[in-house]
Each structure stands twice: as structure tokens, then as C-alpha cells.
Amino acid sequence: MAVKKAALACTVCGSRNYSIAASKNRTQRLELKKFCKHCGKQTLHKETR
């Protein structure tokens, strides 16, 4: 299984706060509720490619 690097971007301010190792076999983008240091609160973060 191949692994690639991907970033998690805040949906509110757009900053890329987290980097993850994601499988290339997955077709849907990952969505997690994480803390954004720029917004100062927990927001939805989506995987960017």
C-alpha cells in the first residue's frame, strides 16, 4: 500500500495546521475536528492534496 503526505487545512481560515501520512487507495478526503491555533478554537479540518 502506497503512502503519501497530505495536509489538513482549517475550513474557517484556510491555514494548513497538520500533516498526515495518507493512503493513496482512499478516495474520500479526510475530515476531522481539530484545534486551529490561528482561530483559537476547534474547527473542521479537511485533507488537502
Curated annotation (Swiss-Prot):
InterPro entries reported in the protein's UniProt record: Ribosomal_bL33 (IPR001705), Ribosomal_bL33_sf (IPR038584), Ribosomal_zn-bd (IPR011332)
Cellular component terms (Gene Ontology): cytoplasm; ribonucleoprotein complex; ribosome
Keywords: Ribonucleoprotein, Ribosomal protein
One Pfam family of this chain: Ribosomal_L33
Domain of life of the organism encoding this protein: Bacteria
Spans traversing the lipid bilayer: none
Keyword tRNA-binding: no
Coiled-coil stretches noted in the UniProt entry, renumbered to this chain: none
Protein name as annotated: Large ribosomal subunit protein bL33A
UniProt organism field: Lactobacillus gasseri (strain ATCC 33323 / DSM 20243 / BCRC 14619 / CIP 102991 / JCM 1131 / KCTC 3163 / NCIMB 11718 / NCTC 13722 / AM63)
